[in-house]
């Protein structure tokens, strides 16, 4: 907590601490204050962290690649995939992928094994869906983060919205469903459009959805039959329900074909 650190500095000043010790603490406080954001949900997170703090992806990718290489040596067949989150600009993904591929190549040479790790994009912003055809030139797969996509499509902060007005909106029939539980038609259309754009650019891509919508039967039906995604992922306790809903969606699609 930066304010606790501020109090600690004041106490040390009063106690006559050395300037050298105080300088270290003041520098730390400035660093922390410099990272505080007014709206962190739309601030420095996701791929933006990798762009600003360029060492971050180096460490993360090296850890994944090294673990995969060592498992291969042990006779295991690991299948890691690396997903770049919160992309909204194609160049964000392109530059980050260049770093990822360089690190994978380095680890492959160091460990003496061939590594084939797909690199995809997490689409969770409306702009990313609009330029999905551009991003698809540089991605092996798309996964839709529909929680954040819902937040940024509606302009809702989920925690605030669910606590303060979504129940009232549902009571007044402004909203039929909680859009964080059942995917909204406009959000579903963004997913459908992005899948269509991505598949037109790269027919070999696979498309998935992660988040709570991946465990909601009504959402699953739309995601498979309208948006045409390949899979959904969800929390473990929702897996049986999700598998049943996915099977029902497939049967409905085959029956109506």
Predicted regions and their residues:
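Conserved alpha/beta-domain cores
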Residues: 1-257
């Amino acid at each position: 907590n930066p304010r606790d650190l501020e109090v600690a500095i004041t106490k040390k000043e009063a106690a006559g601490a050395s300037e050298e010790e105080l300088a270290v603490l003041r520098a730390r406080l400035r660093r922390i204050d410099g990272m505080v954001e007014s709206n962190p949900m739309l601030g420095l997170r996701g791929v933006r962290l990798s762009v600003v703090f360029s060492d971050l992806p180096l460490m993360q990718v090296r850890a994944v690649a090294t673990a995969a290489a060592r498992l291969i040596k042990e006779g295991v067949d690991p299948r890691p995939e690396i997903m770049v989150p919160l992309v909204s600009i194609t160049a964000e993904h392109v530059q980050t992928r260049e770093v990822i591929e360089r690190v994978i190549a380095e680890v492959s040479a160091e460990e003496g094994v061939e590594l084939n790790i797909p690199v995809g994009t997490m689409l969770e912003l409306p702009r990313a869906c609009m330029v999905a055809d551009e991003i698809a030139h540089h991605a092996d797969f798309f996964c839709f983060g529909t929680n954040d996509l819902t937040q940024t499509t509606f302009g809702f902060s989920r925690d605030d919205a669910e606590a303060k007005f979504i129940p009232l909106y549902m009571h007044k029939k402004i909203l039929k469903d909680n859009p964080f539980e059942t995917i909204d038609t406009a959000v579903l259309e963004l997913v459908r459009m992005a899948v269509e754009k991505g598949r037109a650019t790269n027919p070999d891509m696979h498309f998935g959805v992660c988040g709570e919508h991946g465990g909601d039967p009504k959402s699953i039906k739309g995601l498979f039959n309208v948006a045409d995604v390949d899979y959904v992922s969800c929390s473990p306790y929702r897996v049986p329900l999700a598998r049943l809903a996915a099977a029902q969606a497939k049967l409905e699609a085959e029956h109506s074909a």
